[in-house]
């Protein structure tokens, strides 16, 4: 899944968090996203 750069790091529909420095696909805390860098928070926040 690809993060939306407008989300600003909040949880989006697929439970993915966007890395602020790379908003177009570096996500964490969800099995459905590729995590190259980890960011704070949980998929339920």
Swiss-Prot record:
Sequence positions bearing 6'-bromotryptophan: 37-38, 44
GO molecular function: ion channel regulator activity; toxin activity
GO CC annotation: extracellular region
UniProtKB keywords: Bromination, Disulfide bond, Hydroxylation, Ion channel impairing toxin, Neurotoxin, Secreted, Toxin
Residues modified as 4-hydroxyproline: 23, 40
Compartments, as annotated in UniProt: Secreted
Tissue: Expressed by the venom duct.
Disulfide bonds: 3-16, 11-28, 18-33, 27-39
Domain notes: The cysteine framework is XII (C-C-C-C-CC-C-C).
Described purpose of this protein according to its UniProt entry: Mu-conotoxins block voltage-gated sodium channels. This toxin reversibly blocks voltage-gated sodium channel in cephalopods, with no alteration in the voltage dependence of sodium conductance or on the kinetics of inactivation.
Protein name: Mu-conotoxin-like Cal 12.1.2c
Organism: Californiconus californicus (California cone)
């Amino acid at each position: 899944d690809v993060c939306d750069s407008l989300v600003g790091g909040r949880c989006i529909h697929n439970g993915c968090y966007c890395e602020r420095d790379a908003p177009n696909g570096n996500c964490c805390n969800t099995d459905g996203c590729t995590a190259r860098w980890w960011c704070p928070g949980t998929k339920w926040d």
